[in-house]
Swiss-Prot record:
It is a peripheral membrane protein. It comes from Mycolicibacterium paratuberculosis (strain ATCC BAA-968 / K-10). PANTHER family: ATP SYNTHASE SUBUNIT ALPHA, MITOCHONDRIAL. It is an enzyme of class 7 (translocase). Its EC number is 7.1.2.2. Pfam families: ATP-synt_ab, ATP-synt_ab_C, ATP-synt_ab_N. Produces ATP from ADP in the presence of a proton gradient across the membrane. The alpha chain is a regulatory subunit. The gene is atpA. ATP binds at G172, D173, R174, K175, T176, G177, K178, T179. Belongs to the ATPase alpha/beta chains family. F-type ATPases have 2 components, CF(1) - the catalytic core - and CF(0) - the membrane proton channel. CF(1) has five subunits: alpha(3), beta(3), gamma(1), delta(1), epsilon(1). CF(0) has three main subunits: a(1), b(2) and c(9-12). The alpha and beta chains form an alternating ring which encloses part of the gamma chain. CF(1) is attached to CF(0) by a central stalk formed by the gamma and epsilon chains, while a peripheral stalk is formed by the delta and b chains. This is ATP synthase subunit alpha.
Length: 554
């Protein structure tokens, strides 16, 4: 039997090797316990060092956000499936505040409020992350809004223009075309995107909050068919999602957009709609036992929207000159814009487009109420050509609405009032526009020129849109240099205006109204001058009846 020999050197080297490769698996974690959970909210005890807005990890990898920091417990909003969270489960701190991945890889994708793809097209590969709660640009970091963001909608670009970096509220009752206005605006950016010029290109973010899944799918389909998904990201928090997701979705969209803005690019973000975000935040606050205020909303509901919308800005040239334009949507009830949330958002934004259900039902689409709608940026966000032709449009339409109400009760109207009514009816018809058919700005200028210049006064109201469509088709085919001149110079010179009038007058000669009648106005006969009037007049002296009777008696 072989003798067992033990070498002290071998034992020593083995121990040294083991000690050198030893790593401690112990770690220090702050762990809390779920006290109660339900309706997407959990109260946790035992996390004394937790930060506000810090991410917490629940069993199964479910995340939560610490909102209420009470003396003995933490109130957290659960992001995801909260049905499996029970009393007594352990909760860990992550030491991180909520952030989302950002970057160009998000273009063309549909994501949830955590930045995770939900469109079935694979993972989104990006190394850049951005915190959701981030300070808005300061006054020094901004510059005034001066570049137009064309929506492609005549009524908006002519009367309530939107500039890059502006916040323009779209407000109205349900089913009045609010989403359609925003989708049209996204579709209208396609030409700029295809130009390849980064100064013209506008990336778009559409945030769907509390919408039906079918509605979000139809918006995505419309964007795909219009070739707009190449430069658009959709952040979806449908009605089936928890209140926490609906509350966070706008901040996620804003973080994705801000990344591009600080990179010197231009972004358009649509919040559809902030009424549902406010309702979700109200539900969260009431469940967390926060004191309710007006309409049961918490006291900081104004701050909820102001800190979101203040991120929209036109950055200074030192920071790259990027911009983020916001189109928040608010749903009213019975056209009441004096309710709590509508007045809050009106006071935060730089103007509003009010869509009225009565106008919508009358067939005026987009159903923009000119009297209540306003843009506080105004002419600074318009090209010179549009500013020239649309200067009197708002006043003409406002006077028409007043006269229309008066004419309903009065039978006798003077010629001036009748002329105003006739022109106003044609302007209303001219501003109607089909859904998902945005119009280039140079064609809008020609269209508005037709109305404000009185060139449609001889065209029957029912033929106004056909006249406009056929004239623009004719100009694209044979008079494209006028359109190209407006597009390139962004001005309508006197020579171009005269040439445009000639084209319109020549086109009128070949245009026939529905009944076959000509739309060329009758030749205007000028009144005689005073000198000619004296030459033509014949003076006849007749004696007075009394004197004539006395002569007969004599």
């Amino acid at each position: 039997m072989a003798e067992l020999t033990i070498s002290a050197d071998d034992i020593q080297s083995a121990i040294e090797e083991y000690v050198g490769s030893f790593t401690s698996d112990t770690s220090r974690e702050e762990v809390g316990t779920v006290v109660d959970a339900g309706d997407g909210i959990a109260h946790v005890e035992g996390l004394p060092s937790v930060m506000t807005q810090e991410l917490l990890e629940f069993p199964g990898g479910v995340l939560g956000v610490a909102l209420n920091l009470d003396e003995h417990s933490v109130g957290a909003v659960i992001l995801g499936d909260f049905e499996k969270i029970e009393e007594g489960q352990q909760v860990k701190r992550t030491g991180e505040v909520l952030s989302v991945p950002v970057g160009d890889a998000f273009l063309g994708r549909v994501v949830n409020p955590l930045g995770q793809p939900i469109d079935g097209q694979g993972d989104i590969e990006t190394d850049i992350r951005r915190a959701l709660e981030i300070q808005a640009p300061s006054v020094v970091q901004r510059q005034s809004v001066k570049e137009p963001l064309q929506t492609g909608i005549k009524a908006i670009d002519a009367m309530t223009p939107i500039g890059r970096g502006q916040r323009q509220l779209i407000i109205g009752d349900r089913k009045t075309g609010k989403t359609a206005v925003c989708v049209d605006t996204i579709l209208n950016q396609r030409q700029n995107w295809e130009s390849g010029d980064e100064k013209k290109q506008v990336r778009c973010v559409y945030v769907a909050i509390g919408q039906k899944g079918t509605t979000i799918a139809s918006v995505r389909r419309a964007l795909e068919e219009g070739g707009a998904m190449d430069y658009t990201t959709i952040v979806a928090a449908p009605a089936s999602d928890s209140a926490g997701f609906k509350w966070l979705a706008p901040y996620t969209g804003s973080a994705i957009a801000q990344h591009w803005m600080y990179d010197g690019k231009h972004v358009l973000i649509v919040f559809d709609d902030l009424s549902k975000q406010a309702e979700a935040y109200r539900a969260i606050s009431l469940l967390l036992r926060r004191p309710p205020g007006r309409e049961a909303y918490p006291g900081d509901v104004f701050y909820l929207h102001s800190r979101l919308l203040e991120r929209c800005a036109k950055l200074s040239d030192e920071l790259g000159g990027g911009s983020m334009t916001g189109l928040p949507i608010i749903e009213t009830k019975a056209n009441d814009i004096s309710a709590y949330i509508p007045t809050n958002v009106i006071s935060i934004t730089d103007g509003q487009c009010f869509l009225e259900s009565d106008l919508f039902n009358q067939g005026v689409r987009p159903a923009i109420n000119v009297g209540v709608s306003v843009s506080r940026v105004g002419g600074a966000a318009q090209i010179k050509a549009m500013k020239e032709v649309a200067g009197s449009l708002r006043l003409d339409l406002s006077q028409f609405r007043e006269l229309e109400a008066f004419a309903a009760f009065a039978s006798d109207l003077d010629a001036t009032s009748k002329a105003q009514l006739d022109r106003g009816a044609r302007l209303v018809e001219l501003l109607k526009q089909p859904q998902y058919q945005p119009m280039p700005v140079e064609e809008q200028v020609v269209s508005i020129f037709l109305g404000t210049g009185g060139h449609l006064d001889s065209v029957p109201v029912e033929d106004v849109r056909r006249f406009e469509t056929e004239l623009l088709d004719h100009m694209r085919a044979s008079e494209d240099k006028i359109l190209a001149g407006i597009r390139d110079t962004q001005k309508l010179s006197d020579e171009a205006a005269e040439e445009l009038e000639k084209v319109i007058n020549n086109f009128k000669k070949g245009f026939a109204a529905t009944g076959g009648a000509s739309v060329v106005p009758d030749e205007h006969v000028e009144a005689l001058d005073e000198e000619e009037l004296e030459k033509e007049s014949v003076k006849v002296k007749k004696p007075a009846p009394e004197k004539k009777a006395k002569k007969e008696q004599k």
